[in-house]
A protein has these predicted regions:
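N-terminal membrane-targeting/pre-transmembrane regions
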Residues: 1-29, 108-109, 133-158
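N-terminal extramembrane/targeting module of integral membrane proteins
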Residues: 1-64
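Generic secretory/membrane-interface signal
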Residues: 5, 79, 128-131
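Short charge-dense sequence patches
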Residues: 31-42, 71-84, 153
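Short, charged/polar low-complexity linear motifs in solvent-exposed/disordered segments
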Residues: 33, 83, 90, 129-131
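Non-transmembrane, membrane-adjacent beta-strand/coil modules in membrane-associated proteins
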Residues: 52, 65-123
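Juxtamembrane amphipathic/hinge helix adjacent to a transmembrane helix
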Residues: 115-142
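Juxtamembrane boundary at the C-terminal end of a transmembrane helix
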Residues: 157-167
Length: 167
């Protein structure tokens, strides 16, 4: 069984952007709202970390999408697809000139292929091995450097906020 977690730079970009945008709020809040804004900040951070904890598992028989506690609470269900039920992979363009990919099953169901997971190439080779489908054109939804850049810019924002606060 193989487990594929959300890509580190996807998680880090979302968490660092959340921090960059919300760290100042408790400090600029009026006195009556400081404690509440700190509590909301911590709850929001927990939610972001939890939501980015989804993962995919593969084994000899199937692929499983495992959702985080919060996603399940919001109604998103874990999914399992048998390898033998996957008929083909279909790509659709996005508005950002990228592509999203779907597993199309023998029943005509569409399941979004997770494109933001660690070891994506290994995941694709497992898909190809178990389904016999050509995966050569399947790629990440966006280049990794975009997530790295967003993380870097968010960290610069946090540093700038700390410098402004300390002065």
């Amino acid at each position: 069984m193989e487990k594929f977690k959300t890509l580190f730079f996807v998680k880090s970009s979302l968490i660092s952007l959340y921090l960059a945008l919300t760290i100042p709020i408790p400090f600029i809040s009026i006195d009556k709202l400081k404690i509440i804004s700190m509590i909301v900040f911590v709850i929001g951070l927990y939610l972001i970390i939890n939501i980015t904890s989804d993962y995919v598992e593969t084994c000899n028989n199937k692929i499983s999408y495992k959702n985080s506690f919060i996603c399940k609470t919001l109604g998103r269900k874990n999914l399992e697809i048998s390898w033998k039920d996957i008929k083909l992979i279909k790509s659709l363009p996005t508005s950002q000139d990228s592509k999203v990919y779907y597993f199309i099953t023998n029943k005509g169901e569409n399941f979004l292929i997770p494109q933001r997971i660690e070891n994506f190439e290994k995941f694709l080779s497992i898909v190809s091995k178990n389904t016999g489908i050509d995966i050569n054109d399947t790629t990440y939804i966006s280049p990794i450097w975009t997530y790295q850049l967003l993380t870097f810019i968010s960290l610069l924002m946090i540093i700038g906020e700390l410098i402004a606060f300390l002065n």
